[in-house]
């Protein structure tokens, strides 16, 4: 370039560059020009013994994502779901979590069902200081700065259910569960509590995840004739268990079963008549009578089919996405450190009622419900907490150190 008098060539160059940059910015900001999407990872089992319970959660996440995108996404960035099948295998799910974080560049993870799966994924999430929304009730005795627990803590599900059963059905009880950390730890808490309340444990049996042979367990229940059974089986084993009870003539009116992992989706899969008259405890039932829930159920059925049902883990998955979207939209925070701070200040009106993220535990304040299964596949609510319950992942009547020592002393089972 020929030098102009007074050094004007430099000024001309600066002006030219500035105009070019401004043109690029204006071009990028033109109406209709899409901003880059923002990815989230979804980790659920679409195959294997857990598929019947977990696959519907992907649809709940999808509904929340579609609703968020319809209202502008995250400040103009559309949310993109990247779904990985965990194959009912905790170790494999951890590998997929690593892939989603390091290769796909997702901003948050939504998923896991069993505690074995969550505990396998947890070190991956913590190693990367990432973020997991875990949507299922669980045994407690855990906190992580990198996990938002949208399912129930023990004092929001299994503890009120066990106490209600003891008060209403009798003091003699039997425990059955899948052989991994959730049933073992949940029953550790229950035995400790019910013993203090004068309860009498008649028997306790654990079966491999996915087990179908229930003969020995049902024979023992028939012989012991407990006032109630507390059931922490998971996955397809529940269908085999209730079929075996029915075949043995063990009925809900004489020996009611209280389940922690059977909801509307499982009733539809295993046959509505099998569990009619038995009980379950959750933080959400599709039959909840409030305007927010009725609208939620209608939107879901319009999107995925009138025959579909909703349950607690699905609603908790939906709520998890809603919490993340609201936090991410706040001051355009997709930075994980800042996002986590915003999340601990979130309160949200949801289909289950008002929920709030507890600053100290990263669990949700939420109500507890006990439902009695009906022949139409829904639950009649027979008890509910008066207010949202403060989450206590470590039940208050022992110290965290005592609980962890008791848990570590359990027999070697799946993590």
Explain the meaning of each model-derived region:
Residues 2-415:
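Extracytosolic ligand-binding ectodomains
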């Amino acid at each position: 370039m020929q030098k102009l008098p007074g050094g004007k060539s430099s000024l001309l160059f600066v002006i030219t560059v500035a105009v070019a940059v401004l043109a690029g910015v204006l071009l990028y900001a033109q109406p209709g020009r899409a901003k880059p999407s923002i990815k989230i990872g979804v980790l659920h089992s679409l195959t294997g013994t857990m598929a019947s319970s977990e696959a519907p959660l992907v649809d709940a996440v999808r509904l929340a994502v579609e609703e968020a995108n319809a209202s502008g996404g995250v400040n103009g960035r559309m949310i993109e779901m990247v779904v990985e099948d965990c194959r009912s295998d905790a170790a494999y799910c951890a590998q997929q979590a690593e892939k989603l974080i390091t290769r796909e560049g997702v901003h948050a993870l939504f998923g896991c069902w069993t505690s074995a799966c969550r505990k396998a994924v947890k070190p991956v999430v913590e190693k990367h200081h990432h973020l997991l929304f875990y949507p299922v009730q669980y045994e407690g005795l855990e906190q992580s700065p990198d996990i938002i627990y949208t399912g129930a803590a023990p004092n929001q599900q299994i503890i009120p259910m066990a106490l209600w059963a003891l008060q209403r059905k009798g003091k003699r009880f039997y425990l059955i569960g899948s052989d991994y950390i959730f049933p073992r730890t949940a029953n550790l808490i229950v035995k400790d509590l019910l013993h203090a309340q004068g309860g009498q444990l008649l028997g306790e049996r654990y079966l491999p995840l996915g087990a179908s042979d229930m003969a020995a367990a049902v024979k023992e229940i028939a012989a012991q004739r407990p006032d109630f059974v507390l059931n922490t089986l998971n996955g397809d084993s529940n269908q085999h268990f209730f079929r075996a009870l029915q075949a043995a003539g063990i009925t809900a009116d004489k020996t009611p079963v209280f389940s922690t992992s059977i909801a509307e989706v499982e009733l539809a899969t295993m046959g509505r008549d099998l569990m009619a008259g038995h009980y379950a405890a959750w933080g959400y039932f599709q039959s909840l009578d409030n305007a927010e829930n009725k609208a939620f159920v209608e939107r879901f059925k319009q999107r995925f089919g009138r025959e579909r049902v909703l349950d607690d883990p699905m609603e908790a998955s939906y709520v998890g996405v809603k919490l993340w979207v609201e936090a991410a939209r706040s001051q355009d925070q997709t930075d994980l450190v800042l996002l986590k701070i915003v999340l601990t200040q979130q309160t949200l009106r949801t289909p289950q009622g008002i929920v709030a993220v507890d600053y100290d535990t990263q669990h949700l304040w939420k109500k507890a419900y006990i439902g009695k299964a009906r022949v139409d596949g829904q639950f009649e609510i027979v008890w509910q907490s008066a207010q949202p319950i403060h989450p206590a992942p470590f039940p208050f009547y022992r110290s965290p150190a005592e609980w962890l020592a008791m848990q570590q002393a359990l027999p070697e089972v799946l993590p």
